[in-house]
Amino acid sequence: MGQKINPIGLRVGVIRDWEAKWYAEKDFASLLHEDLKIRKFIDNELKEASVSHVDIERAANRINIAIHTGKPGMVIGKGGSEIEKLRNKLNTLTDKKVHINVIEIKKIDIDARLVAENIARQLENRASFRRVQKQAITRAMKNGAKGIKTQVSGRLGGADIARAEQYSEGTVPLHTLRADIDYAHAEADTTYGKLGVKVWIYRGEVLPTKNTSEGGK
């Protein structure tokens, strides 16, 4: 199953935390849809800002949003102008008080979503699918990744029959729950149709911390 399931979902509650932290009973569906609306809005507003993922916390009538990005300066803007505009738009969208925290991603070459989107952008600019994958793998390994696997699928090079080609380096232990594996997929719109891009990056092992109050050592 480790080969098929989403590596992030498999590790939630083991070495990964939830990206949405709130509890609701009867309002669960409406709040979940609001979360999806917020994430879609942020992705559209910050298309060029290299946003990896968004964490959402709720408390009463307040929403705390953490934006993990490779370009914090673009999100914040000069003197905080851009982030203030974004906050006002989100306040209007949700009709709640929104607080935004921007977190910088130090190593963008070992963040799966940023790597996948970078490959997709290059494919849209007619770059060679083999070259962009090999370049992404080289950069990731230089920046401390223990292993990486990339896959591009679709009408590669304009071929009549769609196929998938993947490249890898190092190890990517998908079955090991303590392995910190980041995964993402992206799409590239080319003249021959869509190409799918998948990226798995192994960043080393994470040992779950034991709770000493429950008898752990």
Curated annotation (Swiss-Prot):
Signal peptide: none annotated. The keyword RNA-binding applies. The keyword Lipoprotein does not apply. GO terms for biological process: translation. PROSITE patterns: KH_TYPE_2, RIBOSOMAL_S3. GO terms for molecular function: mRNA binding; rRNA binding; structural constituent of ribosome. Keywords: Ribonucleoprotein, Ribosomal protein, RNA-binding, rRNA-binding. Residues 38-106 form the KH type-2 domain. GO terms for cellular component: cytosolic small ribosomal subunit. Disulfide bonds: none annotated. It holds the Pfam family KH_2. Part of the 30S ribosomal subunit. Forms a tight complex with proteins S10 and S14. Belongs to the universal ribosomal protein uS3 family. Binds the lower part of the 30S subunit head. Binds mRNA in the 70S ribosome, positioning it for translation. This is Small ribosomal subunit protein uS3. It comes from Staphylococcus epidermidis (strain ATCC 35984 / DSM 28319 / BCRC 17069 / CCUG 31568 / BM 3577 / RP62A).
